[in-house]
Regions:
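N-terminal secretory signal peptides that target proteins for export/translocation
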Residues: 1-5
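Generic detector of solvent-exposed, compositionally biased contiguous segments
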Residues: 8, 16, 134-136
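Bacterial N-terminal signal peptides
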Residues: 10-24
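SH3-family beta-barrel domains
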Residues: 29-63, 74-78, 85-88, 92-100, ...
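Intrinsically disordered, low-complexity polar regions and short flexible loop motifs
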Residues: 66
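Beta-strand-rich domains and repeat architectures in extracellular enzymes and scaffolds
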Residues: 70-71
Length: 180
């Protein structure tokens, strides 16, 4: 039977461990979070969140940052855009346009910017104006390389065609992002 002193000491020890154990144990939820949702990444000092693309034709998204973690999702499209939301050592937490994702090794990612067409049928225009001539059309799911962006329009290249598309018709660029 425990004495009141031992019970109090056990309670204090349990509270201490609960409060500070996540700070010092690799692989815990705090360590795996990688960073806050916005700001600079703790590993690269690059902005978070930010867009990248899948360098490989296949990439495993894991439950946590490390090979010992279970694979939750497999990305199977080279050049698909992904959103990095956190960093931990050589791992990046990413998600696709549907919110699917997990932790992926940084060597499978590229800084080359791409976008996915989200509209059922997106029109590529000659210039960033709604009344400019349509040069091509792209179906939903088409992946294109991102070029210049204005507040509401981006120039993309896909399937040998180039043109300006409304930002609302693509995923892989921040709403107010401007690129030159």
């Amino acid at each position: 039977m425990k004495t009141p002193k031992r019970a109090a000491l056990a309670l204090v020890c349990a509270a201490f461990l609960a409060a500070f154990a996540p700070l010092s144990v690799p692989g815990t939820a705090l360590a795996e979070s990688g960073a806050a949702e916005t700001g600079l990444g703790p590993v690269t000092s690059m902005p978070l969140p930010r867009f990248v693309s899948l360098k490989a034709s296949e990439g495993n998204a894991r439950r946590g940052p490390g090979l010992s973690h279970r694979i939750d999702w497999v990305f199977r499209h080279r050049d698909m855009p992904l959103l990095i939301t956190a960093e931990f050592e050589n791992w990046r937490r990413v998600e696709d346009r549907d919110g699917q994702g997990g932790w992926i090794h940084y060597t499978l990612l590229s800084g080359v910017r791409t976008v996915t067409v989200t509209a059922e049928l997106a029109e590529l225009h000659d210039s960033p104006e709604a009344d400019s001539p349509v040069t091509a059309k792209a179906d939903a799911g088409v992946i294109g390389r991102l070029g210049t962006c204005q507040p509401d329009w981006c120039r993309i290249a896909a399937g040998g065609e180039k043109g300006w598309v409304r930002k609302s018709d693509i995923w892989g660029v921040m709403p107010g992002e401007v690129r030159e």
